[in-house]
Amino acid sequence: MVVIGEKFPEVEVKTTHGVIKLPDYFAEQGKWFVLFSHPADFTPVCTTEFYAMQKRVDQFRELGVEPIGLSVDQVFSHIKWMEWIKENLGEEITFPVIADDRGELADKLGMIPSGATITARAVFIVDDKGIIRAIVYYPAEVGRDWDEILRLVKALKVSDEKGVALPHKWPNNELIGDKAIVPPASTVDEVKQREEAKAKGEIECYDWWFCYKKLE
């Protein structure tokens, strides 16, 4: 099983868009990817998730992020299910879906719960260097919230770019709104620097260990 901060395992996979190599396929394009597993094709909760993901796919792509699905179904099942979604729900699925019919990648990533033969609803966010940045699991009986996954991706990218941390429900936090948290001071000198920055109006603080600022 892999964990956050590790390199995504190099693997060749069969998808609805042909055979691709992960994570290189996206890394070579300078893109992040969101790999998400679903328990099975032609099931109600999974259908709502695919419909909702396609509705938001442009928002992911605007961030330089590509979605890619996965289940232990065969590729022809994926294709037929995607046809059904287009014909009955009016959404053409434009992202690839992995046919992991032997469950090898799902097993390697820890997507299959103990005693089960199908995947849970796992989400792996992988950056453009092939590093796993976040992992989220939902049980089969509860569908995911893609808006929260979008928020998570945005927060990771802002954190990388600005060197800050992001609070609960950012950018709609109850305490500091859309502001970002400055990394806590770890030395006496850094405490003084925080106090000086606060005096200059560069940051705001509840205390020296809890400072925040407006993102520019």
Swiss-Prot record:
The active site is a conserved redox-active cysteine residue, the peroxidatic cysteine (C(P)), which makes the nucleophilic attack on the peroxide substrate. The peroxide oxidizes the C(P)-SH to cysteine sulfenic acid (C(P)-SOH), which then reacts with another cysteine residue, the resolving cysteine (C(R)), to form a disulfide bridge. The disulfide is subsequently reduced by an appropriate electron donor to complete the catalytic cycle. HAMAP family: Peroxiredoxin. Homodecamer. Pentamer of dimers that assemble into a ring structure. InterPro entries: AhpC/TSA, Peroxiredoxin, Peroxiredoxin_AhpC-typ, Peroxiredoxin_C, Peroxiredoxin_TDXH, PRX_1cys, Thioredoxin-like_sf, Thioredoxin_domain. Its main location: cytoplasm. It is found in: Cytoplasm. This is Peroxiredoxin. Keywords: Antioxidant, Cytoplasm, Disulfide bond, Oxidoreductase, Peroxidase, Redox-active center. The active site is at residue 46. GO terms for molecular function: peroxidase activity; thioredoxin-dependent peroxiredoxin activity. One of its GO terms (biological process) is cell redox homeostasis. It catalyses: a hydroperoxide + [thioredoxin]-dithiol = an alcohol + [thioredoxin]-disulfide + H2O. Substrate binds at residue 121. Signal peptide: none annotated. The keyword Oxidoreductase applies.
